[in-house]
């Protein structure tokens, strides 16, 4: 691996530095470049654009294996590199689900060949033996979709994971209430083409009940919880009370931060997601971000055909890898978010929560994962010229100010000027 010097980098505290990269690792951070380094290394002039640690997305659905019509490890990680991400962690709900050692190994082999960024895998929860067997493969966490299981099943699954010392990532919606609401609302044929009805079926109360149950199980089994895509202010209040005594981290998604259920009027079923977009009585906004520990895109791509069905049959999910950073940098320019907060939420904290070694900081000895941003670049978000297979976004035509212009993964430039480049990716554990 050739060495690289990043010249004239502006840090988030407005210092101009040069970063010396050797064998994919940050060797040094200096104010000047030594003559020997000028002669032997590749020099890349950053031109006083701002550098931040490469973004880490701990919540993506790359659909590979089994659903490659939606996304693949190639297209999904190209989208990640293009969006400023250097590390992603994939969710287990592929076909087959990543809930056995064999399925875990098969997915990792696919990712190793195809991925444009470094990666980890969350494991599903099946039997106790499967949970124990997967431990040798070093999963980032175990993941449970609470809306798919009964209380008895959840109790057993929490128990299994408690024996691993791994985090438990949770999708928090109450199965009984969601099933009842959907069954009731389906009886009215007028609801078939009203996407907003879906948000009432998967109600704020369903999230609150599930989170409360998760907290009680965490007390019982002494687990580290990572609560994915929390979507209501009321749930946040409950979690913060519990955080005083329990090890809990909270994730926000860009679509829950920047959208509400009025989006359904403009965008219909293409904005359908789980949990759904909330109304103003419940929804979180950029002003609530200081209450969260991390931002995950919940990048959940589908085909246009799968999205353009009626309210109940349309696939739920929104792509986010190529829009998230633009949305967040716009809020930095709007003075509603600081770069320090952005770095914590998208890099430092995700690395800490999931114990990812040598990532999340621009620091001597760490992986040279760096995202270069131009805070003055302007434009409109468009699905054109994106790498994801999911050719839709509820942020279409939204103005942005600030964008990533280069992504560097372990000293390799993997994205620049809207192009992406492949180098050897690695499993992060």
UniProtKB/Swiss-Prot annotation:
Pfam family membership, one: Amidohydro_1
Protein name (record): Dihydroorotase
Native organism: Methanosphaera stadtmanae (strain ATCC 43021 / DSM 3091 / JCM 11832 / MCB-3)
Lineage of the species this protein comes from: Archaea, Methanobacteriati, Methanobacteriota, Methanomada group, Methanobacteria
Highest taxon of source: Archaea
Family: Belongs to the metallo-dependent hydrolases superfamily. DHOase family. Class I DHOase subfamily.
GO molecular function, one term: zinc ion binding
GO cellular component terms listed in the entry, alphabetical order: cytoplasm
UniProt KW Hydrolase keyword: yes
Function: Catalyzes the reversible cyclization of carbamoyl aspartate to dihydroorotate.
């Amino acid at each position: 691996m050739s060495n690289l010097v990043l010249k004239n980098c502006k840090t988030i505290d407005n210092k101009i530095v040069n970063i010396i990269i050797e064998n994919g690792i940050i060797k040094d951070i200096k104010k000047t470049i030594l003559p020997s380094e000028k002669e032997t290394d590749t020099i890349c002039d950053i031109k006083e654009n701002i550098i931040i640690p490469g973004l880490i997305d701990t919540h993506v659905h790359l659909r590979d294996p089994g659903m490659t019509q939606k996304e693949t490890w190639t297209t999904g990680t190209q989208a990640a590199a293009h969006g400023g991400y250097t590390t992603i962690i994939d969710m287990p709900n592929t076909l087959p689900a990543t809930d056995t050692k064999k399925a875990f190994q098969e997915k990792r082999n696919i990712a190793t060949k195809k991925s444009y960024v470094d990666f980890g895998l969350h494991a599903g929860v099946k039997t106790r033996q499967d949970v124990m067997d997967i431990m040798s493969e070093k999963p980032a966490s175990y993941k449970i979709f609470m809306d798919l299981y009964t209380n008895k099943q959840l109790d057993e699954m929490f128990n299994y994971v408690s024996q691993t010392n791994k985090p438990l990532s949770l999708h928090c919606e109450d199965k009984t209430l969601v099933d009842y609401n959907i069954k009731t609302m389906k009886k009215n044929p007028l609801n078939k083409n009203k996407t907003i009805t879906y948000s009432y079926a998967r109600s704020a109360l369903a999230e609150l009940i599930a989170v409360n149950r998760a907290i009680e199980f965490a007390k019982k089994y002494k687990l580290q919880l990572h609560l994915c895509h929390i979507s209501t202010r009321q749930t946040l209040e409950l979690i913060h009370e519990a955080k005083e005594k329990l090890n809990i981290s909270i994730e926000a998604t860009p679509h829950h931060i920047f959208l509400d259920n009025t989006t359904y009027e403009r965008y219909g079923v293409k904005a359908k997601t789980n949990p759904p977009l909330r109304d103003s009585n419940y929804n979180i906004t950029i002003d609530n971000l200081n209450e969260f520990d991390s931002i995950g895109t919940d990048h959940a791509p589908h085909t246009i055909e799968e999205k353009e069905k009626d309210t109940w049959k349309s696939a739920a999910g929104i792509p986010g890898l190529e829009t998230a950073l633009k949305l967040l940098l716009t809020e930095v320019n709007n003075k509603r978010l600081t770069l320090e907060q952005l770095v914590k939420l998208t890099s430092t904290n995700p690395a800490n929560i999931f114990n990812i070694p040598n990532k999340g900081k621009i620091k001597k000895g760490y992986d040279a994962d760096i995202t270069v941003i131009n805070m003055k670049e302007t434009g409109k978000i468009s699905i054109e010229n994106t790498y994801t297979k999911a050719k839709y976004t509820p942020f279409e035509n939204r103005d942005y100010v600030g964008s990533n212009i280069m992504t560097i993964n372990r000293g390799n430039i993997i994205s620049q000027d809207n192009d992406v480049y492949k180098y050897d990716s690695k499993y992060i554990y």
